From Swiss-Prot:
Region of interest called Protease, as start-end residue ranges on this chain: 567-724
Subunit: Interacts with CCAR2.
GO CC field: nucleolus; nucleoplasm; nucleus; postsynaptic cytosol; presynaptic cytosol
Composition bias, Basic and acidic residues: 272-283
Function according to Swiss-Prot or TrEMBL: Protease that catalyzes two essential functions in the SUMO pathway: processing of full-length SUMO3 to its mature form and deconjugation of SUMO2 and SUMO3 from targeted proteins. Has weak proteolytic activity against full-length SUMO1 or SUMO1 conjugates. Required for cell division.
Record family assignment: Belongs to the peptidase C48 family.
Organism, scientific name: Homo sapiens (Human)
Keywords carried by this UniProt record: Cell cycle, Cell division, Hydrolase, Nucleus, Protease, Thiol protease, Ubl conjugation pathway
Subcellular locations according to the entry: Nucleus, Nucleolus
Protein name, as recorded: Sentrin-specific protease 5
Molecular function per GO: deSUMOylase activity; SUMO-specific endopeptidase activity
Active site: H646, D663, C713
Stretch list, region Disordered: 268-321
Length: 755
């Protein structure tokens, strides 16, 4: 196993020298190192057979070694003439001629000859200087033996590959002798097409001893990505991808930002991930644009603050805003991914905060000026542009220090050359930059005179975000609208003490009339206070409820009784109407008495003990109960049935001789109906009413309101009795029971039916 590993390590060393450059051109591109099998086989002199798994492990091991040997240098980008290729092809043809032709994969001598002839024919037509050709050839072939690529992580340096090991072709353009041009070097193998490698200065740079080593791109030190050289389009695993994100600088500071609740990171920064250095020296008075643009020739052409309407195509910049040039340090425009850190110098962790100067105004008010700007459309637009647009950013509102969170962030990537805009500062305000090859221009745009700070626009639903409170800035004094406490509400002229005194007097009246606060509802309390103070106290419900609770605690016991005819109710009886208590016989009987007195000629209500007495003692036990009443002259008889734990109702309609059973749980007690039928027959014989001795029918009513708990059966029975006696429909349900209980309590205390 060790021997096998040593062999693979040696193969990796040879494979690392197959191609030494990557393609960059100033952009974010991966490092492409593919396996140059033909040169490897030519060096080893024997067939090489190894499976994919061994290749994968060998590639991973060699990747770590190569990465440690990288040296920061200028990228290689050279352009030369075709004549140099003649020498390279000649050396290649001599290198290719080996005894064993089976070591090559797909190339043949014929293809090499055709390629050489093609390059020679194209080289004859060019008239270029030979000095640059020789310099380039020398720069390409003369690699120092002790270079970083010649050593693999401190191991013994090996022989550098000769020019014949690299089949290359050179493409170039004519240049003046005094001009430091660029050279493009194309390296080919026998399997793939040519690869064009990175950009650099001319061969004069490498003549001074600078090695031709690929430049390691200057990424952000916190976001430096390490890629394996032998991973061509190899997809990173999800674990490694998430690990890199968690180790990034963004997520290290995200928790601190959330705790401080200063702002949220914009969507653009979450996507791009790479921060550029903040340029504060040129943007103290306003926001800076992340897009490169030359300095304005006229210093008077400074951009003024401009607030358009909801159209986000206008341009806004600070009074002293300065547009930095992204090429001042030699970095390419596409070399770094753009973020909003450059656009707003005061931005922290992806959130922009623009502090508005309050020195000129004593109160925190908005003052907007309408400006008209014209922007000329550029004649030429670049093919690729990066557009970032954020609809709402953070802003500090003067002395109130009110901060609104970012509501909507969007990023658009356009290849058709659309306008580039960045909108910020709590509204659809934008910044535009147009890339025109190597020059960028920043112009002000818009002919809109409407102010975004007008109340009409701010009231529009598109100007509001569901994640933040609406911002009201119509020239009036800015108030605290974040907490929505007492500051945002209209001050009440009634103080707490005055309200407490009035409320205590009202509760005294309720206690005197009803003996308790059970029948009192919230609507009645608010209505009484409104009648007294002519003001709505709905916003002070917590204070009112607290006062009522304290009052109830001070008046727990009250000697209160109700007398009606022969009935008497005390506080224990009335307490059964509170909450989910079961009604007792005293409440049922007294309320039945009120119903019977409401329609005395039509309805007769039997006592709740009637059925129990009838079952236990028979007809003789209840014979004298109707001594003074002729039941057959009534139209409706109401008989409550109390079965210890449940209340039901039996009604007798004398006009059609029907005995009906009403139960709020859908139960039918046939023996109860049969007992009432026998009683009526006996009563008809005793009172000499032969017409009621026959024709009796029984019925069970099912389509009636039903209870949904185990405590409101007595309330349902009383409601059945009232509706039947007053000939009202059953328009109540379980949800109405709390209200019905309070109403029954009041009716018992006032000894009359209210409706």
């Amino acid at each position: 196993m060790k021997k096998q590993r040593k062999i693979l390590w040696r193969k990796g060393i040879h494979l690392a020298f197959s191609e030494k450059w990557n393609t960059g051109f100033g952009g974010f591109k991966k490092f492409y190192f593919h396996q140059h099998l033909c040169i490897l086989k030519a060096k080893l002199g024997r067939p090489v057979t190894w499976n994919r798994q061994l290749r994968h492990f060998q590639g991973r091991k060699k990747a770590l070694q190569i990465q440690k040997t990288w040296i920061k240098d200028e990228p290689l980008c050279a352009k030369t003439k075709f004549n140099v290729a003649t020498q390279n092809v000649s050396t290649l043809s001599s290198k290719v001629k080996r005894k064993d032709a089976k070591h090559f994969i797909s190339s043949s001598k014929t293809l090499l000859r055709l390629q050489a002839e093609k390059l020679l024919s194209s080289a004859k037509n060019s008239d270029h200087e030979y000095c640059r050709e020789k310099n380039l050839l020398k720069a390409v072939t003369d690699f120092p033996s002790n270079s970083a690529l010649g050593q693999a992580n401190g191991h013994r340096p090996r022989t550098d590959p000769q020019p014949s090991d690299f089949p290359m072709k050179f493409n170039g353009e004519s240049q003046s002798p005094g001009e430091s041009g660029t050279i493009v070097v194309t390296l080919n193998n026998h399997k793939r097409k040519g690869f064009c490698y990175g950009c650099c200065q001319g061969p004069e740079h490498h003549r001074n001893g600078g090695p031709l080593i690929p430049k390691k791109f200057q990424l952000n030190q916190h976001r430096r990505i390490k890629l394996s050289p032998l991973m061509m389009y190899e997809k990173l695993s999800m674990i490694r991808f998430r690990y890199r994100i968690l180790r990034s600088q963004h997520f290290r500071t995200k928790s601190k930002v959330c705790k401080l609740r200063k702002a949220q990171r914009s969507w653009v920064q979450k996507v791009t991930g790479d921060h550029q250095e903040t340029r504060r020296e040129n943007g103290e008075g306003g926001s800076c644009s992340p897009f490169p643009s030359p300095e304005p020739k006229d210093p008077s052409c400074r951009h003024q603050p401009y607030f358009p309407d909801m159209d986000s195509s206008a341009v806004v910049k600070g009074t002293n805003s300065h547009v930095p040039d992204c090429h001042t340090k030699g970095s390419s425009f596409l070399g770094k991914e753009l973020s909003l850190d450059e656009a707003f110098p005061d931005q922290q962790n992806g959130s922009a905060t623009n502090a508005w100067d309050q020195s000129s105004c004593s109160s925190p008010k908005w003052e907007c000026t309408e400006l008209i700007h014209d922007i000329p459309l550029p004649e030429h637009r670049s093919n690729t542009m990066f557009i970032s647009e954020t609809e709402r950013e953070i802003m500090t509102l003067g002395q109130e220090n009110q901060t609104s969170s970012v509501s909507d962030d969007r990023v658009k990537l356009s290849v058709s050359g659309a306008d580039t805009s960045v909108s910020s500062v709590d509204g659809p305000v934008s910044q535009k930059a147009v890339q025109n090859e190597n020059s960028y221009q920043m112009e002000e745009d818009g002919s809109l005179k409407q102010s975004i700070l007008s109340s009409e626009l701010l009231d529009h639903p598109y100007c509001k975000s569901p994640l933040e409170a609406p911002l009201v800035c119509s020239g009036l004094k800015l108030e605290n609208q974040v907490g929505g406490g007492k500051n945002s509400q209209k001050a009440s002229p009634v103080d707490d003490e005055q309200l407490s005194v009035c409320l205590s007097g009202f509760l005294d009246e309720v206690m005197k009339k009803y003996g308790s606060l059970v029948p009192l509802s919230e609507k009645e309390v608010l209505g009484r206070l409104k009648d007294v103070f002519n003001e709505d106290f709905s916003n002070r419900k917590p204070f009112i409820n607290r006062e009522i609770t304290n009052y109830r605690a001070r008046h727990q016991k009250c000697n209160f009784r109700i007398f009606y005819n022969k009935h008497m109710l005390d506080m224990d009886d009335l307490a059964t109407l509170d909450g989910q208590n079961w009604l007792n016989d005293q409440v049922i009987n007294m309320y039945g008495e009120l119903i019977m007195d409401a329609v005395p000629d039509k309805v007769h209500f039997f006592n709740s003990f009637f059925h129990r007495q009838l079952v236990t003692k028979g007809y003789n036990g209840v014979k004298r109960w109707t001594k003074k009443v002729d039941l057959f002259k009534k139209s409706l008889l109401l008989i409550p049935i109390h079965l210890e734990v449940h209340w039901s109702l039996i009604t007798v309609t004398l006009s059609n001789r029907i005995i009906s059973f009403y139960d709020s749980q859908g139960i039918h007690f046939k023996f109860c109906v049969e007992n009432i039928r026998k009683y009526l027959l006996t009563e008809a014989r005793e009172k000499n009413r032969p017409e009621f001795l026959q024709g009796w029918q029984t019925a069970v009513t099912k389509c009636i309101p039903q209870q949904k708990n185990d405590s409101d059966c007595g309330v349902f029975v009383l409601q059945y009795c009232k509706c039947l006696a007053l000939e009202q429909p059953f328009q109540f349900s379980q949800e109405d029971m709390p209200r019905v209980r309070k109403r029954i309590y009041k009716e018992l205390c006032e000894c009359r039916l209210m409706d």
